[in-house]
Curated annotation (Swiss-Prot):
Belongs to the prokaryotic/mitochondrial release factor family. Residues 2-98 are annotated as: rRNA-recognition domain, N-terminus. Keywords: Protein biosynthesis, RNA repair, RNA-binding, rRNA-binding. This is Peptide chain release factor homolog. The gene is prfH. It comes from Escherichia coli (strain ATCC 25922 / DSM 1103 / LMG 8223 / NCIMB 12210 / NCTC 12241 / WDCM 00013 / Seattle 1946). One of its GO terms (molecular function) is translation release factor activity. Folds similarly to release factors 1 and 2 (RF1 and RF2). Transmembrane segments: none annotated. Residues 180-204 are annotated as: rRNA-recognition domain, C-terminus. One of its GO terms (biological process) is RNA repair.
């Protein structure tokens, strides 16, 4: 199981629209490659159809190859739909990958099983597959009910906790804070992994 974070990296609303379009495209590619995608967290932009960032999980035999094809800088070439007279046509987003050793923190996590709620059909409503996991040392807690089995939810919970711990460590590091402020600049100067064109988000 892999986590991918899509980020506009403090870019303008056009970059946030690019995040939304990239996420939609990624989900379609995952479906074609039999990779299960779960959208875990999103931060909306100024407009309803935009995303400042999105955190997703990928699971399946082709998950690594799919993530490899997306990680890095993504370029979107399109006139601004929000500022018609704006001269800029190149917009960028960044996609980062996170994996963790599933056994590394298993002893430091307390699990509670819960009855799943919300959409998911009869199977979800009749099983206690949802999991709340708490990292004892930090107090970080996550609830996962997106997978169909308790085992899969525990795997995703461990990965989410590991990701949140890394984010916490980054926030506590002055040097890494500085690196994150430079992220947008680095994205724009980097060679794009993939390039898409127009509102239809066509690759080429």
């Amino acid at each position: 199981m892999i986590l991918l974070q899509l980020s506009s990296a403090q870019g303008p609303e056009e970059c946030c629209l690019a995040v939304r379009k990239a996420l939609d495209r990624l989900i379609k590619e995952a479906t074609r490659q039999d990779v299960a995608v779960t959208v875990l967290e999103t931060e909306t932009g100024r407009y309803s159809d935009t995303l400042r960032s999105a955190l997703i999980s990928l699971d399946g035999d082709n998950a690594w190859a799919l993530s490899e094809s997306w990680c890095g800088t993504i370029q979107w070439i399109c006139p601004s739909p929000y500022r018609p007279h704006h001269g800029r046509k190149n917009w960028f987003l960044g996609i980062g990958r996170f994996t963790a050793d599933e056994q590394e923190q298993s002893d430091a996590i307390r699990y509670e099983t819960l009855r799943s709620s919300g959409p998911g059909g009869q199977h979800v409503n009749k099983t206690d597959s949802a999991v709340r996991a708490t990292h004892l040392a930090s107090g970080i807690s996550v609830k996962v009910q997106s997978e169909r089995s308790q085992h899969a939810n525990k795997r995703l919970a461990r990965l989410l906790i590991a990701w949140k711990l890394e984010q916490q460590q980054q926030e506590n590091s002055a040097a890494l804070k500085s690196q994150r402020r430079m992220f947008h600049h680095q994205i724009e100067r980097g060679n794009p992994r993939r390039t898409f064109t127009g509102m239809a988000f066509i690759e080429g």
